[in-house]
Amino acid sequence: MTTKRKIIGRLVPCRCFRGEEEIISVLDYSHCSLQQVPKEVFNFERTLEELYLDANQIEELPKQLFNCQALKKLSIPDNDLSNLPTTIASLVNLKELDISKNGVQEFPENIKCCKCLTIIEASVNPISKLPDGFTQLLNLTQLYLNDAFLEFLPANFGRLAKLRILELRENHLKTLPKSMHKLAQLERLDLGNNEFSELPEVLDQIQNLRELWMDNNALQVLPGVWKLKMLVYLDMSKNRIETVDMDISGCEALEDLLLSSNMLQQLPDSIGLLKKLTTLKVDDNQLTILPNTIGNLSLLEEFDCSCNELESLPSTIGYLHSLRTLAVDENFLPELPREIGSCKNVTVMSLRSNKLEFLPEEIGQMQKLRVLNLSDNRLKNLPFSFTKLKELAALWLSDNQSKALIPLQTEAHPETKQRVLTNYMFPQQPRGDEDFQSDSDSFNPTLWEEQRQQRMTVAFEFEEKKEDDENAGKVKDHSCQAPWERGQRGITLQPARLSGDCCTPWARCDQQIQEMPVPQNDPQLAWGCISGLQQERSMCTPLPVAAQSTTLPSLSGRQVEINLKRYPTPYPEDLKNMVKSVQNLVGKPSHGVRVENSNPTANTEQTVKEKYEHKWPVAPKEITVEDSFVHPANEMRIGELHPSLAETPLYPPKLVLLGKDKKESTDESEVDKTHCLNNSVSSGTYSDYSPSQASSGSSNTRVKVGSLQTTAKDAVHNSLWGNRIAQSFPQPLDAKPLLSQREAVPTGNLPQRPDRLPISDAFTDNWTDGSHYDNTGFVAEETTGENANNNPLLSSKARSTSSHGRRPLIRQDRIVGVPLELEQSTHRHTPETEVPPSNPWQNWTRTPSPFEDRTAFPSKLETTPTTSPLPERKEHIKESTEIPSPFSPGVPWEYHDSNPNRSLSNVFSQIHCRPDSSKGVISISKSTERLSPLMKDIKSNKFKKSQSIDEIDIGTYKVYNIPLENYATGSDHLGSHERPDKMLGPEHGMSSMSRSQSVPMLDDEMLTYGSSKGPQQQKASMTKKVYQFDQSFNPQGAVEVKAEKRIPPPFQHNSEYVQQPGKNIAKDLVSPRAYRGYPPVEQMFSFSQPSVNEDAVVNAQFASQGARAGFLRRADSLASSTEMAMFRRVSEPHELTPSDRYGRPPYRGGLDRQSSVSVTESQFLKRNGRYEDEHPSYQEVKAQAGSFPVKNLTQRRPLSARSYSTESYGASQTRPVSARPTMAALLEKIPSDYNLGNYGDKPSDNSDIKTRPTPVKGEESCGKMPADWRQQLLRHIEARRLDRNAAYKHNTVNLGMLPYGGISAMHAGRSMTLNLQTKSKFDLQELPLQKTPSQQSNILDNGQEDVSPSGQWNPYPLGRRDVPPDTITKKAGSHIQTLMGSQSLQHRSREQQPYEGNVNKVTIQQFQSPLPIQIPSSQATRGPQPGRCLIQTKGQRSMDGYPEQFCVRIEKNPGLGFSISGGISGQGNPFKPSDKGIFVTRVQPDGPASNLLQPGDKILQANGHSFVHMEHEKAVLLLKSFQNTVDLVIQRELTV
């Protein structure tokens, strides 16, 4: 209501001289936070006519108010009135009374004295009855009593004869008084949401009734209603009506007829007599046929008959010439009548989920058609006449589609030889059949029971290496988190449908699934699984090779193997063993991941290598890789089928390494560990792909880097091909040609996938392997192809597709790819260059599911990359083209993994590089946490298309095998330019993590890093040239580094490879960044980051690349957060200065943290501006989404998340962990992230703090693990245990805890913050990556990792989910806030990213606040404070309910999309009445802040202006005065 002022007075020349006063008739005190009626009102009691007191906190009306005899309108809605005083009777002239939204329980009897009342608005009050006096208000024309407690109306209600509008919605009325027939003037009657079981008899007597709402009641028949000749609008939806009378034609004036959600089996022919009908909705009924007379509705504009059982449409539908909207979704239509072409005014037509096998040519006549949804049908192609639809703006062929319009190409029909239109999404594979199958076929009761018993403990028997090699693919873990925990059923191999049933947790499908045959010719099933995220939750994909990693991932891609690596508590002995295992994994190329298909892995390696040199055609090699897992086709299918199974429980089951000789079992145990971690990661990430991906990723991380690289290369080619996944993987594709096609999402889709390259992948020996790195769909997708050898089709396709779009295939891909990779990761390691496989889990880290969109499933991505021609790949490749210059062209990015398995696993393996068995450490703590959020999202189907893989990313766990020695060295060589030899060198476990660098750009960075695929050379301990690149990615020179230094080879992605991707893949496809307008990840990671000194940069670049899991670890990266964390911990803190890190583009932030692995790496990252700051590492993202009980995906979610919930992508809600995870679980989740954070270089992770004293050149120190790193690590762990409260809730970890001391908690926090802050510059460009849930997780994880630069295992201790004490939190509060903000924002944006520019609007740049917020203790104390490390996962922070602070960037469109309350002079807030701060009270669902803010958020700053002690009005004006971009620092109470 607008404030009105009437000035009544004599027109005097100058009233001011005459002393005349204005006569006030209208006063408006709305929204003034008043607790009582202002006394000024009474000064005008004689003249006051209108008084507005809306939205205050008035509890009672003073008697004086009723002396205002002239008052005609009294408006007091939204206050705290509990009653109306009887003195209201004195307002005899009152005409309008509005008391809605109060606590008024009844009207006083004497309200009858207000004879002039014409309008009463009393909705939303606990009014249980109306007094008899109420019926004496004879002048009443409008009465609104919605949402009250009325059970009946007064018997003489009919006396209100002048009533025109009567709204009684949402009450408890069961009948109407008979006197109602006297309401002759009643035109609108709303009785919706009441308890009518039959239509009141009096209704047919209200002849003038024009609008009638009777929805949401229990009506079964509609007698008499057809007698209302004047009726224009009739809503009878949501009742139990079974039949409609022939008399319906009596309502001859009817224009809108809504009969949705009833039990109608047919419509009467007389419906054709409703000549004026413009809207007819009969959706959600049981109609089997439509009457032919429907063609007589010549004025019909909207017709909705979705969700029925129609098997045909009447040909008379062609007479509906006025029709504009036609919805026939979810029916059983095998074809459309040719006459439909006559409906030439139709602009929107949806035919989703039918059985259409072909479309009539006549559709080409529907010239005005703008939106056409054909998803989930059985179309093999489109008629050539589609080329005539010039106005077509959206053509939906798949639920996983990332772009509204996907290019079509002309082909000749194989049978008729006619020209038809097709693309990679054809032929369609309906998910329905698959879904139906998965419930029964893929459900294994025995497996379910076994898993249920073991859900909380995953025991991996690590036998001798031989056994490990043989069984690497098998998940020995017998128990996983029960699927029910994830709301999933353990559907073993074919959860094609898994419609949200309780799937076993990732279906302990590991072994069983592996052993279970996966229908090779089950593309539909796989597709169904993938396509239905809802299914994917329940799906438990078998992870043949990924068994080691326990097929948790198969579950939903979220829970994958999350717990596999969870150690109840990382006791010193355990840590040592774990480290040894990791080292062994790193040191032993193929034993660790060897699976039943280990031989195939070897083949894959060779094949991959060949692929590396070939282009897409090499796909068969990828297939081989897939074969190594199980049957490539089967695996793929399985992966596809059980993507949802990948979901891991928020708190993954704990893994217990049964092997006593961890070193011996390192091969298997390490691999298994890796698998476990990675699986967890991938499952968390994949969500859709989880079964195979997570498993495969985890188990098969071993996939050869070579194959990964090959995949990446292929991916480039594939992307070039666009959607030729089938071509890429002819063999596996055969099994799932449709899937592959589907998977090959349009280029538009690709970027989404690219958003989330598995960091692990990149990390894996093929940091250079663009494909790995490109988890996001870039090279990583190619890598997925390699993983595809598990399910070649699935993998390569899935990756690509997943990158691209959300093809259902993607889901499948994801599921399958990872397990293989994990399994074969070890094999892949076989080649020296392929040493990286040692970190198999990295690969599995994330295979993006269609929804996840390359969340964090490197293996999936990797598999897809080589073979999949998804546009996404192209996009990544293009971006990588920009990167190529920085990469040394020397080593093309041949896939170093010889094993076909290598796919993503390989990438991880490369990253693992097995630098030194003794030194390799597996950090899993974070990855598990990440995974869980992602899984959570998957579970809740939070992933949005946009979220796709990216969002899902956070669900995966990444484990990096980082030899402690390599910490420093690995760090050095892990730089973006990570030396091939380093990466490949067994001692370069960290090298294998090089992908961490690319993480930020999972897409193009993968390419870039892929080119630095040094891993092939990795084993050679020769001097390598490390190339430095300027920000433009132009090589500035090569620095020769000795192998011992473990400087990662310059990104040896062959510039050719990288370039190829760049050329082949549209930038949009190449990288989510590019897609969203963000600078390519590669650019973001450009080595030009000046902050790192050139030399250090060179080393750092290489070291960073390999060493920083973070790099790889973009939110999308598959590498487990912990691994990345470890890598980064080793190198990043020392090598990068906080400023450097921050200097990097936002993507880099997360990666940076992971990059902390080595100084050189971090420097490189800085230089790149990508690794750390550019986007959060996958871990970070994951940490955000996963670590924090953030509600990912949704809102990401999505994330996407998705969806990841927008709540706080990085917030603790990501993982709905109600109970704190055990220390082991925490460690397992956090280590990788923590490790990243721990990298000595990261002290400046709180980069703004610039605490990181280690100079850029410190990279060496970063790269090298302190001699006593183990002790330090153990101390850190112990300290963390003791000081968990000391750690920041967020990823801010006292860096001091880390052995590198130099990296203090600040560093870790900074890492988180960095992502946000750095992002502020590049927000739009780079945030997308971070926005992916996985990235977000990475950020969180990374922050933690950065925080504790000490031992690799430090992350475990740090990884605890304990929330640091408030004091610490406050110290790093700002920092944390920014981190959190960035995480949550990133997470959201991630969700949004794949499909929308949301990323832009929510750029999670860490305002300077994150950096500024130093963690003094963390900075000051580096080594000694492990206990303090913020290693607590970001997810943890919310667990304790600590308020988290975030940085949120909102782009006005046109407004900010949220409402605030509170302030010094405000009316308070409903969240914390005692807090006078500014709180967000409402967020517009689809507005700019929808994914960023949530009610209850406290605004601390806006564009630098403090909102802590600000008046409400000033805050409103300030927010309105800002231009387009508003950067907020908010505080959110995060609770799990």
UniProtKB/Swiss-Prot annotation:
Phosphothreonine carried by residues: 830, 864
Low complexity composition bias: residue spans: 858-870
Provenance organism: Bos taurus (Bovine)
Function: Required for normal synaptic spine architecture and function. Necessary for DISC1 and GRM5 localization to postsynaptic density complexes and for both N-methyl D-aspartate receptor-dependent and metabotropic glutamate receptor-dependent long term depression.
Descriptive protein name: Leucine-rich repeat-containing protein 7
Omega-N-methylarginine sites (modified residues): 1148
InterPro entries in alphabetical order: Leu-rich_rpt, Leu-rich_rpt_typical-subtyp, LRR_dom_sf, LRR_R13L4/SHOC2-like, PDZ, PDZ_sf, Synaptic_Scaffolding_LAP-MAGUK
Keywords: Cytoplasm, Leucine-rich repeat, Methylation, Phosphoprotein, Repeat, Synapse
Domain of life of the organism encoding this protein: Eukaryota
Subcellular location: Cytoplasm; Postsynaptic density
Skewed-composition ranges (Basic and acidic residues): 662-675, 871-881, 1131-1143, 1242-1262
